[in-house]
Amino acid sequence: MKKLIISCCLLATFSAAGAWADAAGDLQQRLDKVKSFHATFSQKVTDGSGTSVQDGEGEMWVQRPNLFNWHMITPDESILISDGKTLWFYNPFVEQASASLLKDATSNTPFMLIARNQASDWKQYHVAQKGDDFSLTPKSADGNLKQFTINVAQNGTINQFSAVEQDGQRSNYALKSQQSGPISADKFKFRPPKGVTVDDQRQ
């Protein structure tokens, strides 16, 4: 009887691991169908009790695996750009920019996961699938991300994604007007405007 229970437990473990692997593989394959795209998005942030904290809008350009431009327009403008090697973050209001190596960037943020779509990133999560909805839970509890969900159609179109932090704060992003196709290389270049203070962390 004891051997039977152990066997059943092992089978359940292997079955769950297989399901996670299949879900992660399906998610990566779907995202791979669209190599580059532009979309506008709306953002809604709520705290742990569900109270609205912030509403915002912006647009994004992605050219996988390592080129992206995330432009938050409202309520406070900010820009996150990767040229494939350097990750730039620019805050126009305070006239400050930071530069870090992309290879050192954390994969513990939803946008980085979507933009890079690298198998090594997905392996850090337990991935569950229900239709077009994918739920990701970090295998390590060290980061601030508690759960990440994303809705991706079979053709690779991302409809929405959300992130829940350890304190219960939830950020929802709904994508609109998504268009796939070539993107100008200029979208992935950043040159700090005159007068901007730069914190260079690449060394």
Swiss-Prot record:
PANTHER family hit by this protein: OUTER-MEMBRANE LIPOPROTEIN CARRIER PROTEIN (PTHR35869:SF1)
Name of the protein: Outer-membrane lipoprotein carrier protein
Subunit structure: Monomer.
N-terminal signal peptide: 1-21
Annotated compartments: Periplasm
UniProt source species: Erwinia tasmaniensis (strain DSM 17950 / CFBP 7177 / CIP 109463 / NCPPB 4357 / Et1/99)
Matches recorded under InterPro entries: LolA/LolB/LppX, OM_lipoprot_carrier_LolA-like, OM_lipoprot_carrier_LolA_Pbac
A GO cellular component entry from the record: outer membrane-bounded periplasmic space
Keyword Metal-binding attributed: no
Known role: Participates in the translocation of lipoproteins from the inner membrane to the outer membrane. Only forms a complex with a lipoprotein if the residue after the N-terminal Cys is not an aspartate (The Asp acts as a targeting signal to indicate that the lipoprotein should stay in the inner membrane).
HAMAP family documented for this protein: LolA (MF_00240)
Origin: domain of life: Bacteria
CDD domains: LolA
Gene: lolA
Keywords from the UniProt entry: Chaperone, Periplasm, Protein transport, Signal, Transport
Region (Disordered): 174-203
Keyword Signal: yes
Family: Belongs to the LolA family.
NCBIfam families: lolA
GO BP annotations listed: lipoprotein localization to outer membrane; lipoprotein transport
Gene3D superfamilies with a match to the protein in the record: Lipoprotein localisation LolA/LolB/LppX (2.50.20.10)
